[in-house]
């Protein structure tokens, strides 16, 4: 009888362990990757860090020349930023980190992507209008921050930052940029 009870408890423990491992495997989203800093628009994709040129501007149907927003300091160096706007999104190009990445001062990259409407989504399917539950399921629980009354949930990979503005438990804006 003792052997039966011991075997029963061992079997029960193993089954519970395997079940809990299976549940964890299904509920923990994959770690953030470089691909998470891209969007698909008009069946074309652009990503943070892509070289800014006529082809990229054409993909998202904005002029190559943007509106100058100013020089913004990163690590004590000022970099030039330009905004390229359309209804669904804002893309910022800059010569960010040209000096550290062995590029010419006039070589520009996509340095920020801001999604303003539900037309665009992240590679994990999150878009403006997604719920906080969908966000947590896709990315996990991120770093929550209240900035001047606005709630943001953020995820970092190296110097890249993926942020979601939340209002009434819904995603209302998505931003991908370089952390400063």
Region spans (language model):
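Bacterial N-terminal signal peptides that target proteins for export
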Residues: 1-9
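A cross-family detector of function-defining hotspots
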Residues: 52-105, 124-170, 176-179
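N-terminal low-complexity, Pro/Thr/Ser-rich intrinsically disordered segments
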Residues: 23-53
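Gram-negative bacterial Sec-dependent N-terminal signal peptides
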Residues: 8-17
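Second-shell loop/turn segments in exported
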Residues: 41-46, 118-126
């Amino acid at each position: 009888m003792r052997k039966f009870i011991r075997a029963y408890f061992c079997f029960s423990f193993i089954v519970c362990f395997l079940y809990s491992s299976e549940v964890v495997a299904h509920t923990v989203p994959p770690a953030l990757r470089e691909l998470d800093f891209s969007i698909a628009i008009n069946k074309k994709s652009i990503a943070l860090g892509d070289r800014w040129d006529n082809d990229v501007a054409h993909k998202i149907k904005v002029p190559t020349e943007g509106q100058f927003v100013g020089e913004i300091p990163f690590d004590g160096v000022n970099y030039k930023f330009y905004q390229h706007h359309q209804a669904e999104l804002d893309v910022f190009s800059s010569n960010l980190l040209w000096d550290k990445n062995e590029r010419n001062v006039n070589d520009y990259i996509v340095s920020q992507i801001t999604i303003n409407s539900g037309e665009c989504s992240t590679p994990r399917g999150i878009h403006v209008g997604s719920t906080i539950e969908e966000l947590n399921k896709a990315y996990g629980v991120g770093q929550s921050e209240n900035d001047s009354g606005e709630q943001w949930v953020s995820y970092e990979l190296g110097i890249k930052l993926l942020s979601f503005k939340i209002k009434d438990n819904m995603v209302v804006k998505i931003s991908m940029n370089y952390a400063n």
